[in-house]
Amino acid sequence: MASFRIRQFQERDYKQVVDVFSRGMEEHIPTAFRHLLTLPRTLLLLAVVPLAIVLVSGSWFLAVVCIFFLFLFLWFLASKPWKNYVSKCLHTDMADITKSYLSVRGSGFWVAESGGQVVGTVAARPVKDPPLGRKQLQLFRLSVSSQHRGQGIAKALTRTVLQFARDQGYSDVVLVTGLLQQGAVTLYYSMGFQKTGESFVDILTWLVDVSLIHFIYPLPSAQKYEL
């Protein structure tokens, strides 16, 4: 098993961090596309539109061409939420990681390093408006390079955030992940996270049925933890 270490983000990591994160998100596009093809509304679209063209024009060739363009359109729909998400992240908090995380009290950004290369990332920062009486930390940007999965890196990065939350006196760690990100969903359940709900970001994510799962990991108080 290849060795790795978890450490705090440094400015020299930026390009590799962006690459690991972007690739990690966009690799879910094929899964989203296959999922979209199984939806009843998609199957209805693929059946009705070509049939209508045959009935109107009498041309099977036009129907085949129509199916080809429908598949292109469906690929575009499946990929759009993931590309939008990556673009939004790179233009907001990940545009300046030091400013967004390392310069903010109670926040952090860590990388997993193996062989001198960044192979994983994770970030955390305080929830702005937590429930009354709770101090919550939100986990963000968990991603591991596809060539380094199965080595426990994602679990180690998540544990780093949990330990940070304990040390900082947080009451909960919360996060949101996509239903189609089955590796992440399985990881969080195995580590004791509890599902609190599901949601859609917008009409596009509803249309392609890419829902988000909300998780929480309750922590003992700092005082209890020290005991």
Swiss-Prot record:
<keyword id="KW-0256">Endoplasmic reticulum</keyword>
<keyword id="KW-0812">Transmembrane</keyword>
<feature type="topological domain" description="Lumenal">
    <location>
        <begin position="57"/>
        <end position="227"/>
    </location>
</feature>
<keyword id="KW-0012">Acyltransferase</keyword>
<dbReference type="GO" id="GO:0008080">
    <property type="term" value="F:N-acetyltransferase activity"/>
</dbReference>
<dbReference type="GO" id="GO:0001702">
    <property type="term" value="P:gastrulation with mouth forming second"/>
</dbReference>
<dbReference type="GO" id="GO:0005794">
    <property type="term" value="C:Golgi apparatus"/>
</dbReference>
<keyword id="KW-0472">Membrane</keyword>
<dbReference type="GO" id="GO:0061733">
    <property type="term" value="F:protein-lysine-acetyltransferase activity"/>
</dbReference>
<dbReference type="InterPro" id="IPR016181">
    <property type="entry name" value="Acyl_CoA_acyltransferase"/>
</dbReference>
<dbReference type="GO" id="GO:0005789">
    <property type="term" value="C:endoplasmic reticulum membrane"/>
</dbReference>
<feature type="transmembrane region" description="Helical; Signal-anchor for type II membrane protein">
    <location>
        <begin position="36"/>
        <end position="56"/>
    </location>
</feature>
<comment type="pathway">
    <text>Sulfur metabolism; glutathione metabolism.</text>
</comment>
<keyword id="KW-0808">Transferase</keyword>
<dbReference type="GO" id="GO:0018003">
    <property type="term" value="P:peptidyl-lysine N6-acetylation"/>
</dbReference>
<dbReference type="GO" id="GO:0016020">
    <property type="term" value="C:membrane"/>
</dbReference>
<dbReference type="GO" id="GO:0007162">
    <property type="term" value="P:negative regulation of cell adhesion"/>
</dbReference>
<dbReference type="GO" id="GO:0033116">
    <property type="term" value="C:endoplasmic reticulum-Golgi intermediate compartment membrane"/>
</dbReference>
<feature type="domain" description="N-acetyltransferase">
    <location>
        <begin position="69"/>
        <end position="217"/>
    </location>
</feature>
<dbReference type="GO" id="GO:0006749">
    <property type="term" value="P:glutathione metabolic process"/>
</dbReference>
<protein>
    <recommendedName>
        <fullName>N-acetyltransferase 8</fullName>
        <ecNumber>2.3.1.-</ecNumber>
        <ecNumber>2.3.1.80</ecNumber>
    </recommendedName>
</protein>
<feature type="topological domain" description="Cytoplasmic">
    <location>
        <begin position="1"/>
        <end position="35"/>
    </location>
</feature>
<keyword id="KW-1133">Transmembrane helix</keyword>
<dbReference type="GO" id="GO:0010628">
    <property type="term" value="P:positive regulation of gene expression"/>
</dbReference>
<comment type="function">
    <text>Endoplasmic reticulum (ER)-membrane-bound lysine N-acetyltransferase catalyzing the N6-acetylation of lysine residues in the lumen of the ER in various proteins, including PROM1 and BACE1, using acetyl-CoA as acetyl donor. Thereby, may regulate apoptosis through the acetylation and the regulation of the expression of PROM1. May also regulate amyloid beta-peptide secretion through acetylation of BACE1 and the regulation of its expression in neurons. N(6)-lysine acetylation in the ER maintains protein homeostasis and regulates reticulophagy.</text>
</comment>
<keyword id="KW-0735">Signal-anchor</keyword>
<comment type="similarity">
    <text>Belongs to the NAT8 family.</text>
</comment>
<dbReference type="Pfam" id="PF00583">
    <property type="entry name" value="Acetyltransf_1"/>
</dbReference>
<dbReference type="GO" id="GO:0047198">
    <property type="term" value="F:L-cysteine-S-conjugate N-acetyltransferase activity"/>
</dbReference>
<dbReference type="GO" id="GO:0005783">
    <property type="term" value="C:endoplasmic reticulum"/>
</dbReference>
<dbReference type="InterPro" id="IPR000182">
    <property type="entry name" value="GNAT_dom"/>
</dbReference>
<dbReference type="InterPro" id="IPR050769">
    <property type="entry name" value="NAT_camello-type"/>
</dbReference>
